[in-house]
Amino acid sequence: MAPVPATQTFLAGEKVTASKLIAATKTPIDFLTNPPRCNANSSGVSLTSGTSTLVTLDAEAWDTDNMHSTAANASRITINTTGQYLVSFYARFPSNSTGYRQLNLRLNSGGSATGGSTWSTINVAAVNGSSTFVTRTLELSCVAGDHYEMFA
């Protein structure tokens, strides 16, 4: 996907023709109606109590900006277009009567639970008799080249 398009200006007194108006508006409108976005997911991750586990995302529902690969670095969502992003991450844990369930979203961690920077950590008490759901949505200023990974 191309970077956020620059807007075109018109000079005072310049005649606005259909072709100039289309050239000035089509690319920005196309960008706004199809922004960069990605929905990658995973199923059946095995976790060890007390250990942060990198979550590998083995499937995609959509990816409009080549932000995820199921073959290389499948745990990463890589930003290719700088801008504001609405980032949601979610996990469902099986029923259990003890402890807490944790999700940690990290920036540029390189696959390490202690690498890079923590953007969000969520701790939720386990629910006995029902699944425990952990979710968070954040608005982030993202820079092209950065990557995000989730640990559970």
Question: For the regions a protein language model found, what residue spans apply to each?
Answer:
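Extended, compositionally biased low-complexity polar/Lys-Gly-rich tracts
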Residues: 6-9, 135-137, 142-144
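Short, surface-exposed coil-to-beta transition loops
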Residues: 99-100, 132-136
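Terminal (often C-terminal
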Residues: 4-102, 107-112, 117-125
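Surface-exposed coil/turn segments at beta-strand junctions on protein surfaces, enriched
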Residues: 78-82, 129-131, 141-143
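Intrinsically disordered, low-complexity regions of eukaryotic proteins
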Residues: 65-67, 141, 148-151
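Extracellular beta-strand-rich recognition modules
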Residues: 83-93, 134-136, 146-152
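Short, surface-exposed linear segments at secondary-structure transitions and domain or protein termini
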Residues: 124-134
